[in-house]
């Protein structure tokens, strides 16, 4: 019985480490993706404001 427990324990340990590493990588990828989305949102907010200011300065 002990001969079966030891390999199963090792497999469980390795799987836990693997899942932990995958989770860290996924979190890092989500953070990078969030930064890109924020940059797009800032651009979307910035361009209409600049357009309104320029149209106000030059008049239509």
From Swiss-Prot:
Primary residence: secreted
First and last residue of the signal peptide: 1-22
Entries under InterPro entries matching the protein: Frog_antimicrobial_propeptide
Cysteines paired by S-S bonds: none
Domain of life: Eukaryota
Tissue spec: Expressed by the skin glands.
Gene Ontology, cellular component aspect: extracellular region
Keywords: Amphibian defense peptide, Antibiotic, Antimicrobial, Cleavage on pair of basic residues, Cytolysis, Fungicide, Hemolysis, Secreted, Signal
Any one GO biological process: defense response to fungus
Function: Antimicrobial peptide active against a variety of Gram-positive bacterial strains but not against Gram-negative bacteria. Has weak antifungal activity against a slime mold isolate. Has weak hemolytic activity against human erythrocytes.
Similarity remark: Belongs to the frog skin active peptide (FSAP) family. Temporin subfamily.
The name this protein goes by in its record: Temporin-CG2
